[in-house]
Amino acid sequence: MPVVTLTGIPGYTGLRIEIDMVCLFDWLLAGCSSKHDYTNPPWNAKVPVQRAMQWMPISQKAGAAWGVDPQLITAIIAIESGGNPNAVSKSNAIGLMQLKASTSGRDVYRRMGWSGEPTTSELKNPERNISMGAAYLNILETGPLAGIEDPKVLQYALVVSYANGAGALLRTFSSDRKKAISKINDLDADEFLDHVARNHPAPQAPRYIYKLEQALDAM
């Protein structure tokens, strides 16, 4: 490993430091951070997608009802629960599309004109869970993400917002929603992914896009 000697710095005269020149080069370009290595560890989507595909008839029905691509729904099922309708996360996200009753579940209830929030048993019901997941994607697309023009960029924005919230995504562009959407529309899909990898506070955000592409390729 190369050695660098620091001189002219108080307290560091003659100090010899070993550095990884590859990491230094990366840092000079964009910052040396493992946060950007969102493809590791590799994710094999084959089995999760196979399990998620068994729910495709429901996904197609929900997609038609809410104007959401059923393949996107299937990909989210594969990523979120691996096709397990009884999955419950540590943060109490429930079911095939891992919905939280108090957040996304409540938002869907409000869209439907209902009070309260869905029960655990309701969220474990495959048809109800997928229907509410599709409804939530519609809420994101027609609400905070409205105005995104590129279909692929919109797809990426949807899954990042689904996983980590639309506000967190938009704030990486601007605190003003309209300005954020305008900046997003200046990017193609690859540029959007690069922006998310470099600027989103959640390391899992770019990895979700990576998993989305793996899942879509496995269908």
Swiss-Prot record:
EC number: 4.2.2.n2
Keywords: Cell wall biogenesis/degradation, Lyase
GO annotation terms (biological process): cell wall macromolecule catabolic process; cell wall organization; peptidoglycan metabolic process
GO molecular function: lytic endotransglycosylase activity
GO cellular component, one term: cell outer membrane
Catalytic activity annotation: Endolytic cleavage of the (1->4)-beta-glycosidic linkage between N-acetylmuramic acid (MurNAc) and N-acetylglucosamine (GlcNAc) residues in peptidoglycan with concomitant formation of a 1,6-anhydrobond in the MurNAc residue
Family that this chain belongs to: Belongs to the transglycosylase Slt family.
HAMAP family per UniProt: EmtA
Function text: Murein-degrading enzyme. May play a role in recycling of muropeptides during cell elongation and/or cell division (Potential).
Protein name: Endo-type membrane-bound lytic murein transglycosylase A-like protein
